[in-house]
């Protein structure tokens, strides 16, 4: 009988946890025996997820910082990697707004089907794989790693610990490298820059993080787990049961039964310290781009956990020039990196790039017809000097790659797609 997929023994797993530097700062409340018990007799290999997680972990330690833009389509991710970015961010907000499986437009309130983000992860990985295949048959070595790691939004888990476990499983199966989980009540979940957020107790979020880690361990993938706290803005909490939350709870109740709690950086610090043993990175969601607040947060967390890596949302919800001058904006990410914010990302970059670029083209087209489109085409031609390739759209989506399949099957094929195409005739 084949031994492919045979799980590791509990002893092997425990040795890995004890000796691999990857796990030196990670606390698990379950045993290697628990993992083995949950694996069954065959463990499926998740190549893209494993590779992505390992690459992301290396980047976080080898690069000054890893920066990413939010993508909501496969082609967006391809252009990001072509342009030089090393990682991809996938925002639940963008999936809600324009990429979910229900086909509706939603605000960021966990209203879309829970398997939507894994589906977009799969779509992005498929697009990156196609770009890699095209590059290989063309002998194009300009991009070192087409399969850039994807960090995806697990939101508040769409329920309890079991929902988190299943969502993490689906993300890993789709090829995710890392996932983040926020400490909001899933049924009342809001975008970090909306009002009405309700926190869950600190211990309950530790269960979320533990469940996400357990799912990765059962899959035998070193997924990067990111803890997010919304305590900087949230003024409600479901319960006063956790002693760590009690110093911030005012004693007032709302008509829904929630407790009012003090928001600000102090509850964020308290929660970050509680989450640190269970998370590879910690993200404090903020309402403004504030370097001093970031420094205060970093120093407080690192005083107790000096090796703790942090993440920062350089959000489009900030009116950047209202808060910062040009010089501060230019050095913003570098200064964050010096504080330990190793993963920095613009969550909704894809939404804004897509909407503005199409509005700009459509406005010009409405006024000036073909002249507006030709201006876009000329900008594409000019961008080829910087590595842009999508001017040749047939090539970009793999017509040449599938011609190669056709001629491999039949070297004398007379039905290849690019031969005789307008692209071959006009774009060389």
Swiss-Prot record:
Q: How is it modified after translation?
A: Pupylated at Lys-334 by the prokaryotic ubiquitin-like protein Pup, which leads to its degradation by the proteasome.
- Gene Ontology biological process terms in this record: cellular response to hypoxia; glyoxylate cycle; isocitrate metabolic process; tricarboxylic acid cycle
Protein EC: 4.1.3.1
Q: Superkingdom, according to UniProt?
A: Bacteria
Active site location: 191 (proton acceptor)
Q: Which GO terms describe its molecular function?
A: isocitrate lyase activity; metal ion binding; methylisocitrate lyase activity; zymogen binding
From the UniProt annotation, give the residues forming the signal peptide: none
Instruction: Describe its function.
Output: Involved in the persistence and virulence of M.tuberculosis. Catalyzes the reversible formation of succinate and glyoxylate from isocitrate, a key step of the glyoxylate cycle, which operates as an anaplerotic route for replenishing the tricarboxylic acid cycle during growth on fatty acid substrates. It could also catalyze the formation of pyruvate and succinate from 2-methylisocitrate, a key step in the methylcitrate cycle (propionate degradation route).
Supply the name of the protein: Isocitrate lyase
* Organism name: Mycobacterium tuberculosis (strain ATCC 25618 / H37Rv)
């Amino acid at each position: 009988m084949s031994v492919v997929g045979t799980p590791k023994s509990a002893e092997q797993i425990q040795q890995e946890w004890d000796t691999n530097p990857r796990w030196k700062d990670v606390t698990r409340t379950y045993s290697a025996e628990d993992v083995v018990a949950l694996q069954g007799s065959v463990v499926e290999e998740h190549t893209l997820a494993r590779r992505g997680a390992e690459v992301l972990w290396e980047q976080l330690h080898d690069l000054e910082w890893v920066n990413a833009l939010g993508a909501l389509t496969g082609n967006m991710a391809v252009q990001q990697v072509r342009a030089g970015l090393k990682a991809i961010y996938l925002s639940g907000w963008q999936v809600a707004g324009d990429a979910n499986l229900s086909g509706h437009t939603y605000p960021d309130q966990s209203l879309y089907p829970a398997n939507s983000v894994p589906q977009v992860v799969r779509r992005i990985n498929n697009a990156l794989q196609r770009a890699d295949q095209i590059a290989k048959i063309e002998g194009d070595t300009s991009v070192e790693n087409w399969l850039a790691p994807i960090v995806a939004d697990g939101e508040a888990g769409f329920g309890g610990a079991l929902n988190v476990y299943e969502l993490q499983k689906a993300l890993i199966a789709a090829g995710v490298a890392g996932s983040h989980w926020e400490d909001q009540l899933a049924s009342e979940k809001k975008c970090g820059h909306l009002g009405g957020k309700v926190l869950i107790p600190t211990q309950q979020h530790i269960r979320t993080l533990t469940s996400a880690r357990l799912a990765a361990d059962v899959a035998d993938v070193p997924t990067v787990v990111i803890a997010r706290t919304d305590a900087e803005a949230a003024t409600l909490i479901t319960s006063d049961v956790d002693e760590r939350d009690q110093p911030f709870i005012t004693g007032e109740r709302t008509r829904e039964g929630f407790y009012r709690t003090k928001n600000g950086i102090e509850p964020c610090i308290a929660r970050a310290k509680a989450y640190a043993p269970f998370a590879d990175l910690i993200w404090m969601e903020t309402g403004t781009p504030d370097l001093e607040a970031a420094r205060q947060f970093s120093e407080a967390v690192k005083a107790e956990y000096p090796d703790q890596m942090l993440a920062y949302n350089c959000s489009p919800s900030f009116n950047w020039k209202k808060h910062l001058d040009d010089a501060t904006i230019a050095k913003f990410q570098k200064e964050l990196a010096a504080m330990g914010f190793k993963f920095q990302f613009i969550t909704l970059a894809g939404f804004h790039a897509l909407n503005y670029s199409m509005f700009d083209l459509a406005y010009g087209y409405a006024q000036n017809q073909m002249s507006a489109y030709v201006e876009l085409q000329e900008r594409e031609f000019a961008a080829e000097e910087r590595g842009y390739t999508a001017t040749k759209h047939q090539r970009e989506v793999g017509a040449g790659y599938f011609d190669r399949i056709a001629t491999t099957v039949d070297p004398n094929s007379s039905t290849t797609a690019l031969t005789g195409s307008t692209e071959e005739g006009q774009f060389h």
